[in-house]
Amino acid sequence: MVTVLVAALVTFTIGTSLLVGAAAVGTAAAVAALSQGLPDPTNLNALTFAQPTLVYDRTGKVQLGRFQRQQRRVVTFDEVPKLVLDATTTAEDRSFWDNGGYDPAAILAAVAGNASSSGSERGASTITQQLVRARLLPADVIAPDADRYVRKAKELIQASRLTAAYPGEAGKQRIVTAYLNEIFYGHDAYGIAAAAKIYFGVGDLSKLTIAQAALLAGLPKSPSNFDPYRYAVPDAKGRLVVPGTAPPVVRRDWILRNLSTSRWTQLSQSQLDAALAEPVILAGEQPLSFLAPHFTWQVRRQVQAILGPGASIETGGYTVITTLDWRAQQLAEKWLAAGAIAPNLKPKASAALLRSLKIGSGDRRWINALRGKDLHNGAMVALDYRTGDVLAYAGSAGYYREDLASRKFEPKYDAAGDGARQPGSAWKPIVYSSAFDTRRLTPGSLLLDIATEFGKGWAPRDADQLERGPVLVRKAIQYSLNVPAIRALQRVGSNAVADRAAKFGIRFTGGRKAFLQAGLAGAIGTVEVRPLDLTSAYGALGNGGVRVAPRMVLEIRDATGKVIYEAPKGKATAAVSPQAAFLTTDILQGNTQPKQNPIWSAALEIRNGPRGQHRPIAAKTGTANDARDLATYGYLAPPNDPKALALAVGLWMGNSDHSNPRSKKPAISLTAAAPLWHAFVRDLTASMPIATFSRPNEIGRAHV
């Protein structure tokens, strides 16, 4: 039969060089010639489909995003209801379950029709032929300039070969399943599962109604012309409804009326009438959006780096399990919106946002105090400093708040990992820990706090403009004094601190050279660093001086579910000695203790233990010149349970364009970044056990 059909095509196309030659040697020879170069039909076994890469949180349950070139979800035969199979064969290939991969009568009719008309080629393609055309023909055969009748002949031959290679019921099931996963349904929907989701919001094919299944089955014939969204109009309820006279509905109705000729489905008259009367209500176009978007984009970069440049993230069908803690992420986004967005809205809108975020009256006081302070953005990182796992990551105060976008607020830009900001006094612990590690200073050392010209015309002062004379290093750090910090850098040396910063994993904007060029000003945080890096560095202080590189990807599986990457233990680097780390920590935790630092502790102390106990935390704020950048960084004591989270949190607030806030009395870190940081850490740790910082055996204690 194949030979006869090819002969018909040969007869119609005599005149082309190929088929004139074929006619000379006979139809059988033409079939043999046309079969040359066709792929092995058993390639169906290895057929893969472009599938999106799915990104999940650390539990594998919360989908953060999907990277895709085509919207597709691959299904098995068992997932496809008989109704969908019947609607599909009714629309595309009524004899599918019995034919040899082609429909002889349809092909002969198409050839006759094309011979008697000067119009375009009539269709006669079965489901098997459509699958062959899409995936099992050489590229040159389906090229736009290829002879369409030669292509049709090769398609017919290959469809016959495919059916022979996969005989019987099982073979038909494989072929129709591949077809249903491959075929284009319009509107960026590839495969029946994606089509059900895009048009009707249905994720489980068994939930499709009879009318919905029929409409979907009718789309592949002409996805553009039959796209329901082209014809949909909103009704009084705001629903997208496709009129009954629209082409996709007319085709749906034709399929419904012919469903009873299919294999399994037999509609009663009442069922048919109900299906014909069912309005086509579309789900509405859903823009592709991510949860934790800045984090998810960073994950994409890391996955590409892990798998190599040859891996296609958009089509590879990978599943990525990340380090993200969804609860922590939600809290980070909540408090950034409350502290950086709400104060810049009009009063009614601000109050509405705070209500939706369920912000209590106590926190509303400091939030409302930020109104008019001209601070429009913020970024936050929370990580487990023992594993390097990034738990929460927000590169702006609201990725999707394009309605508020301005020079001062760029919602899409990632200020946590791509951007860099001046840390101000939050940098000082890096300088002092270097001094402790090299034994240039101890917490009991004295440094002179008096106005000094350190360079031509540069005589920095403390924020309060006071001079205290000789001060203990401990007090100089706790009260964030600038002049003693500069003297500390003098003792250690900029090169030594730059070396130490590299061990802490800190990347300066402009590189090491920028820090050295800053000279002694580098002691007070004038060189920009990434919040992600500085958060990790603070975590190293809590981890006995050992910095574990941040990571975001825990596991990658391929499209078959096989694990192809499992994150190794985080790379650990000794940044400072355990003794130096503890000395720094011991001083910084005083910032959260009222007896040691009543000013800073008012903003930073957290009392959320089981009975309201004080929670040991080491923290430091930072305010850059002119209050352009505000920061708070800190870390909790490591829990005794090695599997429990050891938390470090970093926060930046400011404006995207690096502009100084236009305010007569600008906010400082203690009134803006510190309370926001405090609220996040307070809420996140509410159910965590209390842990304390342990002193190394080599460290003694003396009163000075």
Language-model region placement:
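Glycine-rich, acidic and aromatic/proline-enriched surface loops and short helix-turn segments
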Residues: 129-140, 181-188, 205, 210-225, ...
